Amino acid sequence: MDPATTLAPLDAALEGLGQGRAEESLSAVVSHLAGLRAASSVESWNAFLSHVRNHPLREAVHRDPFIFRCYSKPRGYAPDAAALDYVLRARELPVRSSDPVSAIHHFATNGQAARALRFRRDAIAREIDAVASRAARPARIFAAGAGHLRECDKSAALRAGRVGRLVAFDMDAENLDAIRREYPTLPIVTHHGTVRQIGEGRHLFGDMDLVYSSGLLETLPHPSAVGLARALYTMVAPGGTLFLTHFLPGLTEAAFLEAYLDWRMVYRKHADLFDLVKELPAETVATWVFSESPEATLGVLSIQKR
């Protein structure tokens, strides 16, 4: 891979940003990097990333607080829940709308990945409402990798008191602090722990009407993802639902996310997602339903227990 040739589109994008053409310029970078990543081995792509990050375009896009927070990883991982709030809550920027940073921020928080994140939040909220409407009692829910739990903003059942308990499980204590601070009147119980501890059965929760995971499976290799799915399924009560979300390989922005946000995920196809749960006892499963976002960038697997 010749850096001089492959970096030329980044030169053009930097010039375009200076001319007020952020959308056009960054879209071209997304397409260019996606093509390079698809045609490269993992080793050559990772080596090329150092050239991308040494190009002055990185400094320009890192003026956006969402992109830079992901890349800088103040909590040790990307993206953290505070970064995702730029996408899920449209946090205001302390800059004028005419500032080039505003255009970069709009691109980053309204692109393909951002739309998938909002789809995920809304899909979880709809599932909470659906489960609560079917439950004979106030619903019991377990959220693995809760983040800031922004599905609460969209769930009618939570606001109406049809959820009896929502266990918010997360490895980041700051996320749990934010949940307690921002949703003090909701029936949320926070619990600090790791994915590994769930997989090992060290945090035992049961009799849940809904158990869901958002953003965890993409961070795990296959054996760990299988173990997490199996452990979460054991928490589901008869008639309850395991709800798994996962980014799909159709995310064109993947190379851009890796280059400028250092946001790396394991992308799994439809069949790969089913492969994570194929060892669940078939006699205990009532239904398996797979759906995906309109752009086929995020998959949802819903498993109802007998």
Task: Please describe what each predicted stretch is.
Residues 1-39, 43, 47-55, 91, ...:
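Class I (Rossmann-like) S-adenosyl-L-methionine-dependent methyltransferase catalytic domain
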Residues 47-107:
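N-terminal, positively charged/glycine-rich alpha-helical extensions of SAM-dependent methyltransferases
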Residues 144:
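Conserved beta-strand/loop positions that form the S-adenosyl-L-methionine
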Residues 200-211:
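A short acidic, Gly/Pro-enriched loop at the edge of an enzyme's catalytic core
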Residues 213-216:
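A short beta-strand submotif of the Rossmann-like class I SAM-dependent methyltransferase core
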Residues 220-221, 236-238:
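Helix-to-beta-strand junctions that scaffold the AdoMet/dcAdoMet cofactor pocket
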